[in-house]
Amino acid sequence: ALGGDYQVAERTRLYGRWERQSGWVSLAGVTDTGRSANALVFGVDSSYLRDTQVFSEYRLRDAVSGRDAQVASGIRQGFDLAEGLRATAAAETVQVVSGDGARARALAFGLDYTADPLWKGSTRLEWRHSGDVASTPGNDAFTTWLWQVMAARKLDRDWTLLARNHYLRTDYTARGDVLQDRAQLGLAWRPVDHNRFNALAKIEHKLERDSSNAAAGDLQSRAWIASTHADWHPSRPWWLTGRLAAKWQTDRLEQGVTDKFRATLVSGRVVYDITERIDLGLMAAIQAGQHGARQHAVGVEAGYLLQQNLWLSAGYNRSGFKGDADLAGYDYTLRGAFVRLRFKFDETL
């Protein structure tokens, strides 16, 4: 996604963004088929009261089925229930102006807790219902539920325990449901006395189930992913990062056929600051699969500091591979040119 906004008045702004989506999860929920789509969105929002936003958007979507035009309007509201306890709520309705889209409604509720210096947590529940498309022979109506919960517990000055769960379910009126459930547990080490080294270890259980296609049956994928990420800053111009990840996956395919997959990935990056605003980097990655399969990627990049903690980098991988998304994380491992944007922030943002 790429976008921007313009402040036209003290409490009113115009905004626009372009979005590119591909795969099984669309902007409205989980799709029944993999697809690609572009979207151009522009609108206006106003803050009439403190912590209250009213918005209206015009969305132009170019999907496989053709071009759809939609008008979306809604409201977002924040409430301070107590010191360190804040609630949020939002409502949205989408009306199709032209095309074969469906009318949709959405509600969202959230809760954030920051009162305790040792504990922090948040949760968010979203509901979205999309109606039937009149031009199609079947009933395409569906309801999507998204529930996210996150918690952080500071163990001491340097160590923090992290937990997160992401639950996404889409129930179709005329067929089965699609489910994604991701549970993560992590441990972060960030020394307070210096900024030379930090590390994050994480283990994740991921479950994906698709019962929306009666001919294919109940498809399921279950995986365990373990990873460790570390950063080392030995001196002012040098930055070294490394990642080690492993994955064990079991898939249930059509007609109950079971398939198992396991792989590991090791990657590293060395960055040298030429000046305060320009850096050069070297990246290497190796992914090892089953039966001795091995792939590697090597590349270089150059970065420029746009503003404090915001870097824009461009690079080229001389060799590469299509890495597993759960193993590679946000690293780009394909062969060819790439552009990436990095933004560093903490819990005070």
Q: What are these regions, as identified by a protein language model?
A:
Residues 1-349:
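Gram-negative and organellar
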